[in-house]
Amino acid sequence: MATESALIKVHVKSPSNKYDVEIAADASVSELKDKVLVFVPTANKEQVCIIYTGKILKDEETLTQHKIADGHTVHLVIRNQARPTPAPAAATPTASSAPSSNPTPSSQPNPTNNPFAAMGGMGSPADILNNPDAMRSVMDNPITQQLLGNPEFMRTIIQSNPQFQALIERNPEVGHILNDPNVMRQTMEMIRNPNMFQEMMRNHDQAIRNLQGIPGGEAALERLYNDVQEPLLNSATNSLSGNPFASLRGDQSSEPRVDRAGQENNEALPNPWASNANQATNNQSNNRSADFNSLLDSPGISSLMEQMMSNPSMQASMFSPEVINSIRQNMSNNPGLIDSIVGQIPSARDNPQISEGIRRSFPQMLNMMSDPSVMEAMRNPRVSEAFRQIQEGFSTLRREAPQLLNLFQAGAMGGGAFGSDANASSAGANSANGLADLFNSMNMGGGRPSSTAAPVNPEQTYASQLEQLQSMGFSDRARNVAALTATFGDLNAAVERLLNSP
């Protein structure tokens, strides 16, 4: 440079800190980022985002172009590290050829013309949860991976739970964790591998027990339980009267902390702050199974199914041709997959007719789910309400008179013992009953409508974040509120959402 440029001081403000940077007045934005990286060594240059008057500054632009002078303030946002997504190009050609290798519905005629007649007897999902192999099969299912790999879907599910909302308001760092797709992915990997999950829990218990031997450690654990763990348990079991994991505690007697000081623990850690459990030790396994059934019967899980069936974009992604073809190909390449699923259904194990009907219904169910007219009908609010009423009826029968539910299922399997007319309207009714059976098989919420939280004013909840967005130059308050609500108050994620939105 022929002439030496004057140095100016620029204030760089992040959501949690403020830095002063001395830089040449005509320096580029890229040079400013290099200066900022000194203060945030954990980030890379591609993640650094400089905002001034509501606009994101590009690397090749200069400070003088935006009239940034001495004493001016710019805002710093660290973008989330983008996780590379696997390219489905290799799977698509093979998936497209899968339908030709599968038997068509016409090759295996169904007496009732009902592709879902056997689905009503699938029983509780707790049977799958208690079986590691079945759980692994569910987690490897393309539909499950599609759902859990969608951050927007997971945010919507969490957002619908009032206990989670209250927890995130009290602990913003929890909201930041829930916005991290890597955390969700690692959690799903842990669930897919039960042995790894059990080992992780054992190490976790030992680490907490050892922490009790440190001065002040027990108080920190109590705060952790009261502020995080207890609200999390309540959010998952808000329909229950107690802690669903109470049966895992066993004997609550424990030696004083001073007697354990300096000693490494090799035993599992009981919960010292929850209510006392009066169950006998020999009933723990039965209680654990009942607890998981009650957990799956909570309104939060029920709202999950309702949101899945009321979100058009989610339905489009769940039942897209690529997903359907992938599932069909997996079923064709692995015949034992269906057998393993059927083997976990109690009613199917005892009834070969239901078992065979389930095996025959899978290909037809996939074909129906890929039919646009069926999906259009399922998006109709009146149809959804009708399915909800049918779901409640099946749930009531399952709880109050399971023998009648089995009788209905036997009638559907045997050619329509209840009002089977050999005409076109009867065939349509059978198809409708088939969809009802499908919803009943997906009934993870016990048929009860999900409880809704009292409306909360997001402008009051995120008042401080709204002020910071306003100071950054984002003047549209409605868009700011929507972005903060979608990201649970995470300012960095909200800014990134605003910048990426049209």
UniProtKB/Swiss-Prot annotation:
PROSITE patterns registered for this protein in UniProt: UBA, UBIQUITIN_2
Compositionally biased residues, Polar residues: 235-251
Source organism, top-level taxon: Eukaryota
Pfam families: UBA, ubiquitin, UBQLN1
Domain Ubiquitin-like: 8-83
InterPro entries: STI1_HS-bd (IPR006636), UBA (IPR015940), UBA-like_sf (IPR009060), Ubiquilin (IPR015496), Ubiquitin-like_dom (IPR000626), Ubiquitin-like_domsf (IPR029071), XPC-bd_sf (IPR036353)
Induction: Induced upon ER stress.
Gene Ontology CC terms, in alphabetical order: cytosol
Keyword Repeat found: yes
GO molecular function, one term: polyubiquitin modification-dependent protein binding
Key words, A-Z: DNA damage, DNA repair, Repeat
Composition skew (Basic and acidic residues), residue ranges: 252-262
GO biological process: ERAD pathway; negative regulation of double-strand break repair via homologous recombination; nucleotide-excision repair; proteasome-mediated ubiquitin-dependent protein catabolic process; protein export from nucleus; ubiquitin-dependent protein catabolic process
Consequence of gene loss (knockout): RNAi-mediated knockdown causes a reduction in lifespan. Induces ER stress characterized by the expression of hsp-4, the accumulation of ubiquitinated proteins and an increase in ubxn-4 expression. Mutants display increased homologous recombination repair in response to DNA damage compared to wild-type worms. Worms lacking both POST (F36D4.5) and ubql-1 have a shorter lifespan and display an accumulation of ubiquitinated proteins in the nucleus.
Keyword Repeat: yes
Function: May play a role in the ER-associated protein degradation pathway (ERAD) possibly via its interaction with ER-localized proteins ubxn-4 and cdc-48.1 and/or cdc48.2, providing a link between the polyubiquitinated ERAD substrates and the proteasome. Also plays an important role in the regulation of other protein degradation mechanisms and pathways including ubiquitin-proteasome system (UPS) and autophagy.
Name used for this protein in its record: Ubiquilin
